[in-house]
């Protein structure tokens, strides 16, 4: 059985047979610009230390900064994240959005963590990746099992580390304590429209 990234590359091959994009163009889309795996140590509420595996894939930034969500799921793994980053690059290009494709994640069942553990994990992801993030570099967003509150923690951690006072590094954050206008359900509405 193929993994998600192998499936994505099979789709690319099929599209190339139909559209004949050219070998050079296809070669550039076969691998991400960056494929980052990190270990995130988190002090658990019981005093123990647990190490979580995290990812960020920056697939292609030919059209603009990398853009894509961060997912928290017990089955998240690098081939899934690579495939999703590839598809994000394609979606942005097809829709004419001046962003590249990126995706991130952590292998975790967030329902098994306390709010404090979840916050420490989220901040730890940013601590490991802050050098590559930013409004003109890589702009993460919520995805599976991540929330506006998690995006707010991540943005806060980014600003603490870098000293940059920006709200543009992470999208999907609460605005004045409320959910961002239009965010809840926007993916579903977009899918229905497409």
Please identify what each model-predicted range represents:
Residues 6, 10, 50, 187-194:
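Active-site-lining helix/loop region of Rossmann-like oxidoreductase modules
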Residues 5, 9, 78, 147-151:
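Alpha-helix initiation and N-capping motif
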């Amino acid at each position: 059985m193929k993994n998600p990234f192998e499936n994505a590359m099979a789709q690319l091959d099929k599209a190339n047979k139909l559209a004949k994009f050219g070998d050079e163009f296809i070669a550039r889309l076969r691998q991400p610009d960056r494929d980052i795996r990190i270990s995130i140590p988190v002090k658990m509420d019981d005093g123990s230390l647990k190490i979580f595996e995290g990812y960020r894939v920056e697939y292609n930034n030919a059209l603009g900064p990398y853009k894509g969500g961060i997912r928290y799921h017990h089955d998240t793994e690098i081939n899934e994240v690579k495939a999703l980053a590839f598809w994000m690059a394609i979606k942005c290009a097809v829709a004419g959005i001046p962003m590249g494709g990126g995706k991130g994640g952590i292998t975790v069942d967030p329902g098994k963590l306390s709010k404090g553990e979840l916050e420490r994990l989220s901040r730890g992801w940013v601590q490991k990746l802050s050098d590559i993030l930013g409004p003109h570099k890589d702009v993460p967003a919520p995805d599976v099992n991540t929330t506006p509150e998690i995006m707010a923690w991540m943005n806060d951690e980014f600003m603490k580390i870098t000293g940059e006072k920006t709200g543009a590094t992470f999208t999907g954050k609460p605005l004045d304590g409320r959910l961002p206008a239009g965010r809840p359900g926007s993916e579903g509405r977009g899918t229905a429209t497409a």
